[in-house]
Amino acid sequence: AHHTGLPYGRVDVGYLLDHAALDAAGRLAFRAKALRAAEHLLLCRYFDYCQVVYQADVVGFEWLLEDVVQYVLEQGTWRNLDKDSVYEMVAKGQWAAIDDMCLMAKISELRGDMGTPPHVQEKSKAIIDRHPPVLLGSAERIGQLRDGWLSDTKTGLDAMVDDLTRKLRIDRAFWKVWTRGQPWASVGGKTEEKQDRRWITILRSDVASERIQEAPGSIMSVLGDRQLDMLRVYLLPPASTCDVEEARRFIDDYLNSRLGSA
């Protein structure tokens, strides 16, 4: 939010830094005076995710890039990019050669290489031509933190896409079921251990602290056990396939039924 200029104000980073401290466990925390500024940071970050990071075309292109880069790595174009290999390439002055231009040149080669699998060819072409995949359907809801709705709905979507794959005779590699659960009160983290370290913490005294959603009177005390559940189904139609409306209808009906039962 501080850098994108999105219309919900600027985070007072300086004020937050002025009130940063360590709690008894040595974790970064903010003094109670900075509670509202910290909540503003979380709200801005939440909307930043929704409007920028999780924007529909951005997510679609990320899927294409991930799949194409994975294919390039599997073909041995570059060595395994583990830590030791990267250190070795840096030492030999080779790492600088693997940049955006190098990757785009490789993707351009894949687009015209008849030995490339069709789905990789199509994805490479879409990246070069800047044509995002088709968004067949999407759903969002604010629900309880990790209540199972997201995973259950994804399971149903995966089964439906498998059926549509057979019915429409479009390879499964052209489809993507994308999900994300974005908590309001957290700044990220995938595992419980990492998640615990990444909660914003507020000092109650000189050393004692509590997570921001436990602070009395905080907005996050209401939103702390909530998350935004997001689901999307993408399709990159092969060149020979144009009609995707049948798939769109099936997916919309399913997602609407799931939202109605939430």
Name what the model sees in each region.
Residues 1-262:
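Histidine-centered, transition-metal-coordinating active-site segments
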